[in-house]
Amino acid sequence: MSQNQIFKKFIEAGALLEGHFVLSSGLHSAKYIQCARVMMFPKISQFLCKELAKKILETFGHIDLIVSPAMGGVIVGYEVAKQLGVPAIFFERVEGQFQLRRGFEIKEQTKCIMVEDIVTTGLSSRECISAINKHSGNVIGAACLIDRSSGGANVGVELVSLAEMTIETYEESNIPSWLNDIPISKPGSRHIK
């Protein structure tokens, strides 16, 4: 499946947004990929996650568990796990730190893949992988639908994606004036209380 076919699914779902966005990383961008818009369509999400599951199998072989960070990774992780026939669990932020809740556990040396919706800087992925390691899981890789860094994000393990996209981002101190003229939207879930 080509990257253009992947992007077409996101466009069909109305998931490629334009405006002034503050990303979970704190960076500013004129474009945002709202993966939840894709995940609201079961046929599209199943199709995309089936393709991602194939890439995971080709790259990493057999795994035991899919682990995702809430919120964005929950549906993607579940659907990928369904395609692979393995369980899926997720970490939730409690006072800014990832924690396992809801009776979830990771048995020692369980072969895990961390699955996200979108990777930009890799911060959420690294935090989730660190949390898996603290629970004695064996993280053998990571996967996402879209890699916004075009391979530039370091998540600490090999990362596979369905598509890579470079979308320019700006530090708060370096926002272009044309972008500053647009009202800010904060669509991510990192700082929700």
Which residues fall in each region the model found?
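PRPP-associated nucleotide enzymes
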Residues: 1-193
